[in-house]
Structures are given as C-alpha cells and as structure tokens.
C-alpha cells in the first residue's frame, strides 16, 4: 500500500475554569491495578547529605536507592534543598527481556545510545539494542517488553528510559529499512507501555527529567507510530487504556460525510468526555480516489504533563485543559471539525481549541476557530496550513520554526527568483556589447553562473519545503532534493570564490593575461567540479545509514552524522576568503593623491563604500551570519537577519551586479535606442511613396 499519511495535527481543548478533581467511575479495575503495581516497586529516596539547610547558589548530588542506577540533583532555593533533576532508573536492555529469556544478554550493534545526562553515573544504555531484541523475541506484537515496563516504578529516570524506548521503536520503523505496517497488536502493546508513564502518579516526576522535551518527544513518537497503523475494519478501537486511547476508521472520497466518535475517560472527572471528529463533505471530495483512513489518539493526562514541564503560555487567556487529541489524517485533508463535551457542565464557560507546536513548546491558537460554544458542547473548525521551511535552516544546527521567518523566507525567495530571472534576461540582451575583453567576459560568466546556481538552489529549496511535513514517507525524494540543494548552493559559493580569484588576478596581474579557454576550464572545474565531489562524497558516506537528511526537513542532517558540515565548512571558508578579497579591493581603492582635497577624500570613501556594497552580495559575505545560526540557543534576531540578507540575495545581485553597472546600463540604452531606430525605419519604409505605389499597382 502506498504511503498515505501527510499530516499529524495535535489539538487540545481547554476551558476557562478549573475542573473538579473527583475520581472517575469508569476503569476502576485498571486504576486499582495501576496503584498495586506502584506499591510493588515503591521508590524511596535515601536520607543523606541533601537534607537540612543550605546556602544559596549551591547544589548537591545524592545517589539513588540500592536497586536503582543514577543520581538525584538538588539545588538550594530559599535555604532549602529542592530536587531539580532525577535520573534514577531500574530499567535496562537486560531487564526488559529477562522474563522472556533469563539468560539474555544482548550485545547487538547499536546506533542510538541513551543519553548519559538522563541516567547519571550509570553506564550508557544502548536503547537501539531494544528494538533488535523486540525483532528477535516478539516481532509480531511487542508483548515481550510490556510486563517489565508495567512492573517498574514510575521514577523520572524510568520515564526518560521509556520515552527513549518508544522513540527508538518509532524511528526504527521509519529509518532502519523495516517498513512493515503496524498491526493492532503492536499498537495495543505500544499503548500499554506509553500508558504506564501517563498516570497521575507520574505527572509530577516529568518535571525532574533532564530532557525537557521528553513529553513532546513522547507525543511525536506515538504519532509517528500511529502513522504506520493499518485499519482493517470500517471503524476500530485499538487501544483502550486509562491514559491513552486509539481509534481508527476507513474513509473514502465517495463518502458524503464522515465522523469518528471517541469516549475518553477522564481521571479527574466523574464522566467520560465524548469527542466527535467530523470531516466535511467538501474536504472529503478533495481527497484522492483511493480509500484511506483517519486515526485519533487521545491523551487524557498529557496536557497536564506538558503544563508541568513547559512554561505557561502568556498569550492564552484561558487555563489549559489536560486532554490532547492527535489526529493522523490522509494526504490532502486540510480541514476537520471537532466537537467536545464540556467537562464542567454546571458552569457557563467560554472555550477554544489550540494546536501544540513541539518546536516552540507552546500552544498555537491560529489553526482553530470556535464555531459554536453552547451549553455543554463546543465545536471547533481546525485547518492545517503548511508553512514554507524557514531559510535559516540552511546553516542552523536545529530548525527554527517561526512565523516571521517563514514570511521572510517566502517573500524573499519569491522576489529573489523573479530578480534572478530578470538578471539572466538582461545579461542575454547586453551580452555581445559587454563581453569585450577576457576579464569582462569571465566577469559576466561568473555573474550568469552565480545567478543560475542561486536560482536553481532556491527552486529546489521551495520544493524541499513541500516534503518537510512528510519526510519519512518521501525519504528517497527528500534525499534527491537535498542533494540538488546541497550541490547548487555549493556551486553558488564556489562561483563566488572564482569571481573573487578573478578580482585578485586583475589586481595583481596587469600585463600578462591568461587564455580565455583556460580561464573557462578553471572556472567550471571550481564552480561545478568541487561542489559535485563534496556532495557525492557526503551522500555516499552518510546515506547508507539514512543519515544524509534530517528527520523533520529535507536538508542536511546534523544530530546523527553532522552532514551539515559538508555545506557549512566550505561556505564559511569561502566567505572568509572573499572577505579578505573585499578588504584588498578597499585598500587598493583608497590610494590618495598627495595634497588631495577633502572632496577627493570623500570621493574615495564613496568609491570604497560602493565597491564593498557591490561585492558583498556577489561574493556572499552576508552568509557570514550563518556562523551565528550554527550555535544552539542563539537569539531569534540572528536567524531573522540571516533570513533577510540571504533570502533576498537574488534581488541584491540584480541591483548591485547588474543595474548599478554603468556598462550594462549603457548597453541597455543602446539596445533600446537600436530597437527604437529599427521600428522608426520600419514605419518610414511602410509609409514611403514608393511603397504606396507598389501597393496601388497590385
């Protein structure tokens, strides 16, 4: 079956008033089992040196109980020790499979290591081995890891371990060449593992995990796993745990309308919450004719966990609710209608739906609007609008998702593409008049190839943005697009390097000139040969392990293989060389005459400024700001400056490299005058008496 998933929307409904905290009547047996399992493996921190009074700005590390690995970190707050990080874990690769195979001691090759920061002083746990163990012992249903997870204490360290476990399972399905679809047994047991760390006892422990993105990682991992789920019947309830529920339904283009209802039990409410997902008829008709499916995953407590870990939204006017719905929708479906039961029906409260943005760790109101808010139900219309990938991703070690950056990128690239096309048209018009000498010929060859490389790179960058929401399903296409982007952006830089070398050649060599054919050969070898070698080596080395592209965008990988260095290092090295060339030009331009007047000095300053302004976009000096975006946690303003300067580079090339060149302007005027002269001559010929007599003689 062809890949059909194009979008995952994470939506949450919340009220303006706090809800009651009474326990539910439903799932009472499951709740009792949950409490019993916790009592079996009670976690009791040791009494030790991190007790009593303390001095401000001090910290204290305390070892975990004897049957746990890791440590507990305390910091002093108002003269009292306060727990900040806890990495105590009892889970490991061996303990997961001990019940299935007591003598199991997995020593399989692994590409994913559990971060040291999450387990304190324990040895690194090769989480990648877990998936290989699953493939060995229980590939059909994943049941072999469920008991070990459910019997473990819900410590912060174990929560982090389980999140990494679920994340690894999901990513291995996508990237390890194992493309089997997820059946209902796998989804059910995967849900049981996730359910263990979503209970009310676990909520407060999420705050002490070193990785503050763990809750968001869990949400994305479950979504990624649910993407592979194949629904067999018309409507199926797959996972029905206390803290996670999954339901799927088949949908088709021919349906008049479609709805999917889900009754979600609430741990802190007396009644279940009924959620109805409707797909409008018009949205269904826009789908492809092949039958598809929609999947909803409900997390009754994940909203509370996200609130516990992430900072509150200052822009939202209402307190957030705990229920989160993840919707896995087919390709082309951009609109849905959500109907929720209000939790507290006795109060008159206003409500709204929002979407979770994992990049910013914030809720976003823009995708959803409230259609009705009457009595006990709320109805919202939610649309999925895919934004263009931010231009700052080209140098960034971590993609920055921001509306301002997206707008700058979209507007800048549109203007740049138009400007570069216009630049090439002008070059074609004036070519015969401006390429008089070898140096002028090579100068315009450089400008044309710089424009062609940047134009092609920008077009492929936009195409790559359209794959960013579905990178895993379109992996081969994403690799191809990334390779072309990589090659043409490198070609841009190497042609700018060759132009800088031509400038140095013109300054240093006055009387002796190189043959045009030799200069052309050197130019194309540098401009296209070097980038091709770098791009081919990069994809050859990294792609066998599927580490060439990012997991969330069609661009060079950073986290696993550092393939981004294959672009950043050559680009920044060329920028450094070109900066030295600009300084050399500035020094060469400022030769003052003896006894020169103040006006002559000002003319020199103006000439230097003009040369620097012209050479800056043509030699790519604006890309020097990319050095700041390579650093994690850098302020958004640097990304904005980088996007502004480089998204508009095509416009700057047209302005400073073409329009401000007086020879090109003169050639254009001559061309226009020549065309006007020809048109006048044609008019005179058509209106001449001789021509008129010939017409009459016919």
Swiss-Prot record:
It is a multi-pass membrane protein. The chain crosses the membrane at residues 410-430, 445-465, 487-507, 519-539, 567-587, 612-632, 636-656. Glycans are attached at residues 61, 168, 213, 268, 290, 344, 375, 466, 559. Residues 353-401 are annotated as: GPS. Disulfide bonds join 353-380, 368-382. SMART domains: GPS. It is found in: Membrane. GO terms for molecular function: G protein-coupled receptor activity. Residues 1-19 form the signal peptide. Orphan receptor. This is Adhesion G protein-coupled receptor F4. It comes from Mus musculus.
């Amino acid at each position: 079956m062809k890949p059909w998933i194009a979008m995952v929307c994470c939506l949450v409904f919340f009220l303006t008033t706090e809800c009651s905290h009474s326990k539910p009547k439903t799932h009472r047996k499951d709740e009792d089992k949950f409490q019993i399992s916790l009592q079996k493996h009670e976690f009791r921190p040791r009494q030790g040196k991190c007790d009593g009074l303390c001095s401000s700005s001090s910290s204290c590390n305390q070892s975990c109980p004897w049957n746990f690995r890791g440590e507990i970190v305390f910091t002093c707050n108002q003269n009292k020790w306060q727990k900040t990080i806890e990495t105590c874990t009892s889970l490991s690769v061996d303990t997961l499979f001990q019940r299935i195979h007591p003598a199991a001691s997995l020593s399989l090759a692994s590409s994913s290591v559990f971060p040291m920061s999450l387990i304190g002083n324990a040895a690194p746990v090769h989480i990648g081995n877990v998936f290989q163990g699953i493939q060995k012992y229980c590939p059909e249903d994943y049941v072999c890891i469920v008991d070990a997870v459910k019997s473990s204490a819900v410590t912060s360290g174990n929560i982090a371990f389980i999140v990494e476990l679920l994340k690894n399972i999901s990513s291995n399905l996508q990237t390890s060449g194992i493309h089997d679809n997820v059946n209902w047994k796998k989804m059910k047991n995967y849900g049981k593992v996730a359910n263990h760390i979503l209970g009310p006892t676990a909520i407060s422990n999420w705050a002490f995990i070193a990785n503050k993105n763990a809750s968001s990682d869990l949400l994305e991992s479950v979504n990624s796993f649910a993407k592979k789920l194949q629904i067999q019947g018309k409507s199926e309830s797959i996972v029905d745990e206390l803290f996670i529920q999954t339901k799927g339904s088949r949908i088709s283009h021919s349906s008049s309308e479609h709805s999917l209802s889900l009754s979600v039990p609430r741990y802190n409410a007396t009644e279940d919450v009924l959620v109805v997902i409707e797909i409008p008829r018009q949205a269904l008709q826009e789908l492809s004719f092949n039958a598809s499916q929609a999947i909803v995953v409900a997390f009754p407590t994940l909203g509370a966990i996200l609130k516990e870990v992430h900072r509150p939204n200052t822009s939202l006017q209402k307190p957030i609710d705990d229920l989160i719905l993840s919707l896995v929708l087919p390709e082309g479906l951009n609109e849905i209608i959500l109907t929720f039961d209000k939790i507290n029906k006795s109060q008159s409260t206003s409500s709204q739906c929002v979407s979770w943005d994992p990049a910013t760790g914030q809720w976003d109101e823009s995708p959803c609007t409230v259609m009705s808010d009457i009595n006990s139900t709320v109805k919202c219309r939610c649309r999925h609008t895919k934004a263009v990938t931010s231009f700052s991703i080209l140098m960034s070690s971590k993609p920055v998702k921001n509306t301002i950056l997206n707008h700058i990128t979209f507007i800048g690239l549109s203007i740049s593409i138009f400007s570069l096309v216009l630049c090439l048209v002008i070059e074609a018009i004036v070519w015969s008049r401006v390429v008089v000498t070898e140096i002028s010929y090579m100068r315009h060859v450089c400008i044309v190839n710089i424009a062609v490389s940047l134009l092609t790179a920008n077009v492929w960058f936009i195409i790559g943005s359209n794959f960013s929401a579905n990178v895993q399903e379109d992996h081969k296409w994403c690799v191809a697009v990334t390779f072309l982007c990589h090659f043409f952006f490198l070609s841009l830089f190497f042609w700018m390097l060759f132009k800088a070398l031509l400038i140095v050649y013109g300054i240093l060599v006055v009387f002796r000139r190189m043959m045009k054919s030799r200069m052309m050969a050197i130019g194309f070898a540098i401009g296209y040969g070097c980038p091709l070698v770098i791009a081919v080596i990069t994809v050859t080395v990294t792609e066998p392990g599927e580490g060439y592209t990012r997991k969330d965008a069609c661009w060079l990988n950073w986290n696993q293989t550092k393939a981004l260095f294959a672009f950043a290092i050559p680009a920044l090295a060329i920028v450094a060389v070109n900066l030295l060339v600009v300084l050399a030009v500035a020094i060469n331009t400022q030769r003052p005459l003896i006894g020169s007047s103040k006006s002559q000095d000002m003319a020199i300053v103006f000439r230097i400024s003009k040369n620097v302004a012209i050479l800056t976009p043509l030699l790519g000096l604006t890309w020097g700001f990319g050095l700041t975006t390579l650093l994690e946690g850098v302020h958004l303003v640097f990304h904005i400056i980088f996007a502004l300067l480089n998204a508009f580079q095509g416009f700057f090339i047209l302005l400073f490299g073409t329009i401000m060149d007086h020879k090109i302007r003169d050639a254009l005027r001559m061309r226009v005058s020549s065309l006007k002269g020809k048109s006048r001559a044609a008019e005179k010929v058509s209106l001449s008496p001789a021509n008129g007599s010939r017409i009459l003689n016919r």
